[in-house]
Structure formats: structure tokens, C-alpha cells
Amino acid sequence: SNLNQLVLEIKQKSELNQLLKELELRSLQNQMNPHFLFNTLNVVSKMAYLEGAEQTKRLIESVATILRYNLSDFNHTSTLGEEVQIVKEYFFIQQTRFGERIQFISEIEEDALSAEVPCLILQPLIENAFIHGVESYEKNGEIHLYIARRNKQIIVEIIDNGVGMADQTKQKLMSYMNERNSMDSFESNKEKSPVSTGIGVKNVIRRLQLFYQRNAQVEIESELNKGTTFRLFIPDFQKGK
């Protein structure tokens, strides 16, 4: 009924506000004095340039870009294009650390990049694939990012050839996606060991559900010692249209 729908929308809005408050708090806890941090990084970057250390300059710029994006207002939306750029900066940093041990392969349809999405949905999933998938590999680690536009939907696939996840872990994530007692579920399923962004996979899933009014779908395929695939199906909301 219309009344039930109204109650559901109010609950979802309340939960979204709660999520945003928590994310803002985490952001505030992490930033301390962001202007000082960014100014310092800018100075170091210029010093690296003057000393001819181009790789170091580029690395510092990537770190600053990711930090600035992670500390931005979580109320604003992004485009997939902005999300992809942050992922590329993240991989530049990781490949600086690990060299050819890890390869990043992307196949992206340009007309999908203007789609409007909640901020910080790709980097946490990519980071999860790296940390829990391929980071331990001495060679031949791969993470693939695939983005396409199909039938008024955006399809995003994040595929790694890493260690995979136990069936129990996958089932927990799947049950979380289908959980209807939203606020209780979020409180009882907070990430116990957050990744460096402070935003875990479950948080990303929940924000997708709230932003798209449960019209987003998430699929997970995983096999131990073979890898994991996260597949997102999200409505094609074009920014500015």
C-alpha cells in the first residue's frame, strides 16, 4: 500500500542519514588537518619535480588525489568516470609498490562513465580484491575492471585471480544483501577489520541499495585458489540529465 511504501522510504532515508553521519565521522577522525596535509604533499611534489624525481612527484600526486576524494562530502554523488580515475590512481600507487607482480586490466565503455553513482563504490571493492585476493602473490596477480552500458543498466565487474573466499564468507555477504531489517543489519554487520579507506564491502553494498532504492543488484562468484568476481547491476542515471 501507499502507507507501507511511505514508511519504507522514511526508514531508508533515516538509514542513509545514519550511514552518512558515520562516514562523515570516520572522515573527520582521519583528516585531522587536511589543508596542512595537502599543502605538505604539494610542497614535497614540487621538491621532487625540482630534483627531477618524476616518478616520486607522480606518486605524491596520486596519494593526494585519493586522500582528497576519500575526505570529500559523502552527501555528494559522483560519476563512474570520477570513480574510475580514483581506481587508476590507486593502482598506480600499488604498482609502484609491487611492480609487475600485480597487473590492472580495464575494459570500459566510455558512454557509461557519465552515469551518476554514490561516491566511493569502486575503490573499496578494488581494494578488497587487492588486499584479500592478490596481494600475497609473488607474480601473475591480476585485477580486471569491466564497465558496460546495457539495456538502461550499468554493469560493473571486478574480477581477480586471487585466493578466493570461503563459501561461508560469500554466503554471509549474500545474506547481508538480502537483509530487510536494514538498520539492525548494518549495526550488527559492521566491518571488523576495515580496509584503509575505512569503507568495507558491506558498506558499499548497503549504500548502493539505499541510493537506488534496492534497484541495484550485486552478484558474487568466488572459488578458493581461483579468484573472485563482484558484479554490480545499477540503474543508468546520467549525471545532469
Each language-model region and where it sits:
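Generic C-terminal helix-cap and adjacent flexible tail
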Residues: D236-K241
